[in-house]
Amino acid sequence: MDINEISSHFSNFSLTKPYLRKQIEQLEKDKEKNPLNSESIKKIFKEKFSFTNFKSSNPNYLKFYYYNSESINDYSWGSSWRSIQIILSYLLSIKNSLNKYDISFKTLFLKYGERTKLINLFKKDNKIQNNNIPNYLNKPFCPFETIDGFADPFISKLILLDFNFSGELLLINDYPKNSYAPKEVFNLIINFEEFVNLLEIHFNDENSTPVIINDGIVSLVITGICVDDNFVYFIIFDPNVKINENCENGIYYIKL
């Protein structure tokens, strides 16, 4: 399944009426699905990806979070939060501090879903000392204010900031029509070719951070890239794993 198919699959998903999603559903313990650890991921990399000139995040620090992991029912709406978990677990693992923090879905969602916390992080990031918040933040953008509880890349950046990690928000070609985040918070608009070039440079680093791509409906994580004379290959961690599907199917490559 490629990115377009995934977006198409979920574009028709809607709720019958708007509401504030402030609760999450706990699954029964016997239905729990555990995130894939680094050993499993290294095995998948070896079996699935035989590219030459393959560059990726360090699999020793990768974990794969996907729908309904940790006994939380987030099927059809939680891919953005799972993407955040993938990034955070990677960055904290590099610092050997993953066990010092609770980055479970439930904790992240309940802590970073509400406006006050996110506004305070925005003020910190922009060195705002008073309450002169830009007007563009008056629109609903927080997960508790939206229909589906989805976390835009803007939310991801603020969460990373709270863990003392930096991030950059880029638009590829245009502002996504389904985004809750204000257009003003993005740093730069680039085309796809520029995006590929940036990824090539980015993944030259042995411990390069995975990259979230998020259109306001579906969130995926790019963990590697291979560029040859004719094609570009992205290694994808896709949290949008169907309920009865093997979670390993959420790790694949797309050829462009």
PLM features per residue range, with description:
Residues 46-146, 157-165:
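Active-site nucleophile-adjacent alpha helix/oxyanion-hole segment immediately C-terminal to the catalytic cysteine
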Residues 5, 19, 36, 40, ...:
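Acidic, Ser/Thr-rich intrinsically disordered and amphipathic helical segments
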Residues 3-11, 15-24, 32, 231-256:
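Noncatalytic regulatory segments and standalone regulatory/sensor domains
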Residues 10, 147-154, 159-170, 244-256:
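Non-catalytic membrane-recruitment/adaptor modules and adjacent regulatory linkers
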Residues 161, 166-238:
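Active-site-adjacent substructure of cysteine-protease-like catalytic cores
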Residues 7-75:
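Flexible propeptides and autoinhibitory/regulatory segments associated with cysteine proteases
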Residues 79, 92-93, 172-173, 224-227, ...:
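Short coil/turn segments at secondary-structure boundaries
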Residues 81-88, 102, 153, 157, ...:
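Generic preference for well-ordered alpha-helical elements
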